[in-house]
Swiss-Prot record:
Family: Belongs to the IIV-6 261R/396L/443R family.
Stated name of the protein: Uncharacterized protein 091L
Pfam families per record: DUF5907
Organism (species): Invertebrate iridescent virus 3 (IIV-3)
Superkingdom of the organism of origin: Viruses
């Protein structure tokens, strides 16, 4: 019954008690209904009735606009702002006692200015105040003083700068210029770190350009002269190094030792015979036996590399092959499930193959058949029970609403029903106890009336019966027994106009009545309406006495010789005249004789004089004194805070203040001056001594301008460049006289070159006519023509001969000859005496084949042999080695097909979950039923708060694929949360259709077990979901991002068995919804779970 809500007839009632109360919302009385109010209103917020309004209009106490007599005071808290406004007592008292406008003047006795004081004229005497113009003029005068501006100018004296410049734009002094020039000349003449060549000689680091060839012996010779002399030698009777034709024999007494030496006849004769190659000596070979190819690239013949010729493998039980990351040949070790037995037989280790049935230690069940519910027994085979003992179920239900399960686990729980209809049509046959009947579609006065059956009679639910509850006012009309109060934010709306004197009135009625009301004019004897004219003005809500209408005649006279005013308590009274005042007729005068003159110790009258004194009136007879312009001289100023002070304002405020003199200013008597002795960072125009460099970025352009370091350095450097020959070389415009050279790096003169050229004619050269060479002649190039001289390398290659004296030729497959260490014989470290096979040169076709279907490897003794395949191994696809077991990448080969040998008979397929499968020619089947598989989910599946889903949520993490003819038995444990204990959750399944076999069991009510289809058998234990929860989960978040998964949750236990009798694979999907799927405003979600299943 927690899923039902009672009909509440209170919603048809007005929320106001008959004994009085407050209305929190608008209340509308529809015509012709009305609210009657007998009592007249007393508080401002009371509703008014018609009689009160009518009386208020006819008896109102108003002041006529045409004028009248006020019976009380008129209070005006605001001071007047316009000339025509009435004034109040405070304003009059303030003006009369001088407390108003007088405050805006500076007293003669002194005071504080709140703004600047303006003085048009500059001071002329020492005791006068100074204005801004005077101070600015004095400061400006400093700028035209004897100083050098930063923008440049003319000096009238010398600038003394004791320090030498360090930066390029520093000004230079005379000492720097003199020292720099002296240093340059000194280094040139003494060759001490100079960049120029001294006349006494030196070392030049660059070429000297000397345009003219020498004409005298002592002159230096340039390249042109020397090249010409050397070129002339080329036409002489000598053999150039580049080669040439010799007209006579060349005799070489020394034997050749290097490859590029020319050889003599004796050497050639000594190397005329070459022997066959042996294991101990180099010689010629024939490309036969294990060799083939050509002499320049000999190769190993195909099929000649036998097991005996292979190098030993890494160790016993290894194979030759390539690994999964590289095609390079490597030694392949055997995995834990492979072995090479005696005689070199490669086979699968039978001890590692799961037995049938698969034992628990191998991930199986240890049994061939299992019926019923499975229970684990450690490492022993699994056993079954017909029924799950209740003590084995965590969170099992013992009773439901006090009812215990029967022998089959079913709980009989009676559910109530709710009927609706007319009040007169209540069933005469009383239904089961708890059944409710709610009146609907009937008269509004009884709609919502509710009854509940006790099995014998209908009992009226009287919690909100209008017939016996006097606390509420009926919407259809009622009589109030107390006051009805409306807050300021709500209102009572009346559509109908009042008729009776006690009827409540609305605004429209009052406005209409006031607009058309006829009220008699007020008279001196009777109240009535007035017009805001004559002595009255303002508005009807704020009437005022018009300005300038209260004449003397309208004031109540006081006693003779009195004035109208207020006494010391603020009350309006007749003020009598004190001593010093007289009144004559209507003239009030001051007795001049009784008023003292102002003095230094008393208040009194003062006189304004245009030619003398310091005061003048602000206007004719204004009574307000102003200080005359220029009247405040130095004598009248108060003493400054100390000697040498000025009047002015500080940098932080415009308030006048005493200004002291800062550094650089001095005052002698009344003269303000700049203290030049303090200007340590200023250069006078008359000259002075600098304590640091003067930075001048621009070079001078006239003779009188100061020069900076860069200009001086450049000018001095250019002197050397035009007067001297730089050590780095340069062009000489004249001749250089030099004695004969003595060192290898000395420049030569003409005489030296001429002597050397002449001496070549009698030097150690080989004439073209032939001669005797006392050393070895080297020739790098091999001869190409018959008449070319041959070097040792060429001779060695040509004189190699075979036995019998025949000239050596390149080896072939049919004849002996020479070979080159290339092709397959170019391994690292190869030499003629020990050639090495090139890495990766022995390809498959060069290996000598073993028997069909064999591998190259090492046997258990470590010897290389042909490894044959055992009975558990096979070779498929020509060269693919396979065992009798295939390991899947998934748990079911029907879902994830094997990639190595799909659909292959006599192969055992192992899934990642330990399941064992074989191919039966149509599909993969488990020989004795698959082992248990397990799926765990941590995904949160949420039915949001405001959503009423039209379809169920699919818990896709728990999906199980079932093939045609396959049976799946699955046990689910699913955690869930609900935001309202009145609304649980439900689970169902999709996938099974009509004709399939499907049944199951759960601990909860589920609304979609597939009842709509003709599924063979359905058995569900009906349990109220909320009884498992117990407490509403008030912290359930409204999204999948919450962290309160363990706050309050319950566990759903569901067991199903599904046989797919169709012809296509089907997916068993868990569905999730509320137990009332169309009910919103409750958040529910699944917060993880698991399923354990197996296939048959």
């Amino acid at each position: 019954m927690s899923n039902f809500k009672f009909y509440d007839p209170l919603s048809e009632l007005m929320s106001g008690q008959l004994g009085g109360g407050s209305i929190t919302g608008d209340m509308t009385v529809v015509a012709p209904s009305k609210i009657s109010q007998s009592e007249p209103p007393t508080d401002p917020t009371d509703l008014v009735n018609k009689q009160y309004v009518d009386d208020a209009i006819s008896n109102g106490a108003f002041l006529p606009l045409v004028g009248g007599t006020l019976l009380g005071k008129v209070y005006q808290p605001m001071d007047p702002s316009a000339p025509t406004e009435l004034v109040n007592k405070k304003y009059v008292d303030s003006v009369a006692t001088g407390g108003g406008p007088v405050d805006v003047y500076l007293p003669l006795a002194g005071g504080t200015l709140t703004g600047p004081a303006k003085y048009a004229s500059p001071p002329t005497t020492d005791d006068q105040l100074v204005n801004k113009q005077y101070v600015d003029g004095q400061v400006t005068a400093l700028g035209s003083g004897p100083f050098l501006p930063l923008t440049g100018g003319a000096l009238t004296g010398q600038v003394v700068q004791p320090s030498a410049p360090v930066a390029a734009n520093n000004l230079v002094n005379k000492q720097y210029v003199d020292d720099t020039i002296t240093t340059q000349i000194s280094t040139v003449t003494s060759n001490q770190n100079s960049t120029f060549l001294p006349l006494a000689g030196g070392t030049v680091t660059g070429p000297i350009n000397y345009a003219s060839p020498p004409t005298a012996n002592e002159q230096l010779a340039n390249k042109q002269y020397v090249d010409g002399q050397v070129t002339a030698l080329g036409s002489g009777p000598f053999l150039p190094l580049a080669g040439g034709t010799v007209t006579g024999p060349i005799v070489q007494t020394a034997p050749a030792t290097a490859q590029n030496h020319l050889v003599t006849k004796d050497y050639v004769d000594g190397v005329a015979t070459v022997s066959d190659a042996t294991t101990a000596a180099k010689g010629v070979v024939q490309l036969a036996g294990d060799l083939s190819g050509v002499a320049a690239a000999p190769t190993i013949a195909a099929g000649v590399v036998t097991n005996a010729k292979l190098a030993n493998l890494t160790g016993p039980s290894h194979l030759k092959g390539s690994n999964e990351t590289s095609a390079a040949a490597t030694d392949i070790s055997l995995g834990p499930n492979l072995t090479i037995g005696g005689g070199g037989v490669l086979d699968v280790d039978s001890s590692k193959i799961p037995t049938i049935p698969v034992q628990v230690a191998q991930g199986g069940t240890g049994a061939t058949t299992l019926t019923g519910y499975v229970k684990g027994n450690g490492t022993s085979p699994l056993t079954t029970v017909a029924k799950i003992p209740v003590q084995d179920v965590n969170g099992s239900v013992l009773t439901v609403n006090g009812s215990a399960p029967d022998a089959n686990g079913n709980v009989a729980t009676a559910l109530s029903n709710v009927l609706t209809g007319l009040d007169a049509n209540r069933p005469t046959v009383i239904p089961a106890s708890g059944t409710m009947y709610v009146v609907s579609g009937d008269d509004p006065t009884v709609n919502g009336k509710s009854y509940i059956s006790n099995g014998t009679n209908w009992l009226t639910i009287n919690t909100a019966s209008t017939s016996n509850d006097t606390r509420y006012v009926l919407k259809g009309g009622d009589t109030m027994g107390g006051d009805l109060s409306f807050p300021s934010t709500t209102k009572l709306t009346l559509d109908a106009a009042p008729v009776n004197a006690t009827d409540a009135v609305n605004k429209q009625y009052v406005d209409t009545q006031m607009a058309g009301a006829t009220v008699a004019n007020a008279t001196t004897t009777a109240p009535g309406i007035v017009q805001l004219a004559g002595d009255l003005s303002g508005t009807a809500t704020v009437p005022k006495i018009a300005n300038a209408v209260v004449s003397n005649q309208k004031l109540t006279p006081g006693t003779s010789g009195t004035l109208k005013g207020t006494d010391t308590t603020g009350a309006v009274a007749d003020v009598t005249l004190g001593s010093g005042l007289t009144i004559s007729g209507t003239t009030l005068s001051v007795d001049a004789a009784s008023v003292p003159k102002a003095g230094s110790s008393q208040f009194g009258t003062v006189q304004f004089n245009a030619t003398s004194g310091d005061l003048e009136p602000s206007g004719a007879n204004s009574g307000i004194a102003l200080v005359k312009s220029g009247a405040i001289n130095n004598v009248k100023l108060a003493n400054f805070s100390g000697p040498s002070r000025l009047k002015g304002s500080s940098s932080l405020s415009s308030t006048p203040d005493d200004i002291s003199l800062g550094t650089g200013l001095t005052m002698t008597g009344t003269v303000l001056s700049v203290d030049q002795s303090t200007l340590t960072n200023v250069l006078p125009l008359s000259g002075g001594t600098m304590t640091g460099p003067i930075v001048q970025p621009a070079d001078p352009t006239s003779d009188t301008q100061l020069a900076n370091k860069k200009y001086v350095d450049t000018a001095i450097g250019s002197v050397g460049a035009t007067k001297y020959l730089a050590l780095t070389g340069g062009a000489v415009t004249g001749t250089i006289q030099s004695p004969a050279p003595t060192a290898a790096s000395d420049l030569t003169n003409k005489e030296y070159v001429d002597n050397k050229v002449t001496a070549l004619g009698s030097g150690p050269f080989l004439p073209l006519s032939g001669g005797v060479v006392t050393g070895v002649v080297s020739q790098a190039a091999l001869p190409t023509a018959n008449e070319d001289l041959a070097n040792k390398q060429y001779v060695d290659q040509k004189v190699a001969t075979v036995s019998g004296g025949t000239a050596a030729s390149p080896a072939t497959t049919t004849s002996l000859g020479t070979i080159q260490l290339g092709g397959d014989l170019a391994g690292v470290g190869s030499e003629a005496s020990a050639p090495v096979i090139t890495s990766a040169a022995i390809t498959n076709n060069k290996l000598k084949p073993g028997g069909s279907g064999t591998l190259k490897g090492t046997d258990t003794a470590g010897a290389i042999s042909d490894v044959i395949l055992g009975p558990s191994m096979s070779m498929t696809n020509g060269n693919q080695l396979n065992a009798a077991i295939s390991v899947l990448s998934g748990s079911n080969p029907n879902v994830t097909a094997p990639t190595d040998r799909p659909s292959t008979a006599n192969v055992l397929y192992l899934g990642t979950d330990g399941g064992v499968w074989v191919w039966n020619g149509t599909s993969y089947v488990s020989p004795t039923g698959s082992s248990f598989k397990f799926i765990k989910s941590t995904t949160k599946y949420t039915i949001p708060l405001t959503t009423a889903p039209s379809t169920s949520l699919q818990l896709t993490d728990y999906n199980i694929a079932v093939l045609p003819g396959q049976t799946c038995r699955a046990s689910y444990m699913i955690r869930y949360q609900t935001g309202d204990a009145s609304y649980g959750v439900s689970f169902g399944f999709s996938g099974p259709v009509a004709g399939d076999f499907f049944f199951g069991h759960s601990y909860m009510l589920t609304t979609n077990p597939g009842i709509a289809t003709s599924i063979n058998a359905v058995s569900w234990a009906i349990t109220n979901m909320t009884s498992l929860l117990g407490v509403t989960d008030t912290s359930t978040p409204s999204s999948n991002l919450g962290t309160t998964d363990d706050n309050q949750y319950a566990t759903a236990m569901i067991t199903v068995e599904f046989t797919n009798n169709g012809t296509a694979s089907k997916t068993l999907v868990v569905l999730f919804n509320r137990d009332l799927s169309n009910y919103p405003n409750v958040t529910q979600r699944v917060v993880g779970g698991s399923v354990e299943y197996r296939m048959y």
